[in-house]
Amino acid sequence: CSSDLNDFIGFWWPILVWPWLLVYPLKMLGNLLVFKKIRAMLGKNFRAGIAGGGAYPDVIDKFFWAVGVNIVEGYGLTETAPIICVRPIVDPILRNVGSPLRGIQVRVVDDDGIILGKCKKGTLQIKGNCVMQGYYKRPDLTEKVMTVDGWFDTGDLAVLTVNNEIQLRGRKKDTIVLMGGENIEPLPIESKINTSRYISTSVVFGTNEKHEDQRYLVALVLPNKDEIEDYAADNKIEHSSFEELANSEAIKKLLEHEIAELINSKNGFKAFERINKIAIITKPFEVGVELSAKQEMMRYRVAELYKDKLRELYTESK
């Protein structure tokens, strides 16, 4: 028995320890040069920051996690007055928004209203004294979101983890259904694409300008102007305007390569989630045009404004 234990330790020890020994010096160096200074700016009494009002970008969440700054993400809606849950300060779990507050019930259901078990993705529903009675003088809208037994349908896709924490997975109305029947949530794909230094914003589509389902995904991409111009200078790409530069073949190939390196099986994406084609746009999104007052992207407005580009993406030869 002792020999078996020694063999077990001898096998796993280098596998577990060596990666830690390689990473730890880098972590200490980062802490000394950068992270420690960031934490010092927040003061000695800082315990945690709060994020809310919109989806908390995964790249920012990971950054503060690495820095050692605790950010607790909250989730709620106006219809739930408004807070449903908050990521705990003690033992927070990345990407989770915490367990429901006292007095609030949550469940996840499928498209037929059947309650799903733990770790199954579906639509998040809420019940409790915090939930509204209905929309003022709009029984038609109330009927769409309230069940007969008092559950409010948030329209958000979520998973309940084994420890009863909520993990948001996107908006149900944003779900893309391809011609092959594949269901795709665009937000995780866009969030990953937007981690590229060369990309400011991206919008993923699976329908053409007539809102007809297609066989593959495409994306509208807004380049990061400063990074693209630096790249052009380093690579001696001549241009007379940013519009000309952004739409040049060299920049298009750069952005396509960036997206291909991010959206692939190595990063957990399926083959049908890859971006088949892109169209480059150069006008930043504005509140009241492509963005809501809460800075949230209005996909239907983007689709309408750039319907000509969507038509080209789905009609030009592959």
Where are these regions (language model features)?
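Short Gly/Pro-enriched turn/cap motifs at secondary-structure boundaries
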Residues: 95-100, 146-149
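Residue-level signal for inorganic ion chemistry
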Residues: 106, 164, 193, 219
